[in-house]
Amino acid sequence: MNIKRAKEEIEHTVKAYLAKDALGEYAIPAIRQRPILLMGPPGIGKTQVMEQVARECGVALVAYTITHHTRQSAVGLPFIRQRNYGGKDVSVTEYTMSEIIASIYAKMEATGLSEGILFIDEINCVSETLAPTMLQFLQCKTFGNQAVPAGWVIVAAGNPPEYNKSVRDFDIVTLDRVRRMDIEPDLPVWKDYACAAHIHSAILSYLELHPQNFYQINADVDGTQFVTARGWEDLSNLLDTYETLGLQADEDLIREYIQHPKIAEDFSAYLDLYYKYRDDYGVEEILAGQAKPAVFARLLQAPFDERLSLVSLILAGLGTRFTASRQADAVADSCYAFLRETKKALATVPEDIPDGSAEMFHQQIMDYDTETQQKRAAGLLSKDALTTRLQVLAVLRGWEGELRRANAAGTQEAFDLLRGQFQSLADEREKAQQTASAALEAAFDFMEQAFAESQEMVVFVTELTVDPVSHAFLTENGCERYFKYNKDLLLDHRKAALQQELSAEQRRHGGV
């Protein structure tokens, strides 16, 4: 199965294992809660999926790469204790709590979450001395003499033997106690994630042209050459930062992430062209509705991959504006909800307390900050959600400063001042939405003039549809031409599907 299907199955499993009956007991007893065993090539996204599942289910996550541990850290350290058995004093060996089990309790204490996921990576690559401990863990859900706490779902991951020489096969007794999921790389599924994760547009357009280069692991006399989903994502983060700093990524740098010489060389050449197209075609001018006439003349002679790269650049420019609009929306919505609570709280502030409104507002901000830090520590905030909360805090602190400088005479005056501050924020949101909408209209103007209803327009509309950020913007704000082309695209798709069905029917009955 692909990683998206695996994520859905794990999410459903967590909900099922943590469901309780009318008496407050787990509906599925712990002994029947089979650990999940994910088997798949390295760098496919197993660890990230666990982070997403934990965040979306609102539970804690403790993740370990077991190859980093010894038997002592997994089982605990031995110590001698005096016991009396049958009237005879004896010395017996006991063990301290496993470091892994202790980490679960520490996570529970730090986050306030009593339920979670224990994720053990590379479980079938452990040393010979640790192998029996891992078998005991999967079969009995214990490390040494310490059981995994109730309410914690066990997920383990490993690599097939063709990807790791250290792999140890599990026996049938162990496999009969786990739920095994075999995961394979899947570019279309990864693209859904990549759009939401803001993977660099050059990488997405390159893989659109060369899908076979998404994931490869090849072994020859020179060693293992590979490229993984993790490599592309990590490279994307670096490219974004390099662009911000005005630095240039060369082939040597790309090889550090894409450890497949031919693919690294090919992508490096493509990246150079990508930046060249961005400058030559003037993408920002296109999105401002000021495309140069020479651009259209050049496109008439341009090969398909160059035209597709330009479409990708236009989509990337739109994506930046859509993201800014969405972020402005999220910040404004959060601040509005905050002000509603502020209005309620102000009603409880006595009018005769100096700076009472400002002090109350300050305490609200402190509470929001504390909540943010707690959720951050628990891993319950996505990158976008954390960014929104940090921006909200910055806005609220600015409002607090205005409130203190104004020295409002009463609670109503204080709230009127805050409401005025919010109106400025709402104006900024409206401006971001208008900027994005204007750029989208300019993009359609250019696409119609340059490509009409060709394959490039199909790609453009399709990418607007599948990208979650652009799709959310279009759903919220609309665009007449997008809906027109999208409708035509759906009709063409249905006609093509119907034609295929008719052709298949004719072959069956006509002997063609």
Model-derived regions, located:
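AAA+ P-loop NTPase catalytic core and its hallmark functional loops
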Residues: 1-212, 217-220
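Alpha-helical lid/collar subdomain of P-loop NTPases
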Residues: 196-355, 359
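Charged/polar, solvent-exposed surface patches and flexible loops
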Residues: 8, 12, 16, 55, ...
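Alpha-helix capping and helix-coil boundary motifs
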Residues: 2, 184-186, 243, 303-304, ...
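Terminal-proximal interaction/regulatory segments of ATP-powered molecular machines
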Residues: 300-512
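Conserved, well-structured beta-alpha core segment at the onset of a catalytic domain
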Residues: 25-34, 43-46, 242-257, 512
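Generic hydrophobic, helix-prone segments enriched in Leu/Val/Ile
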Residues: 10, 100-104, 242, 433-443
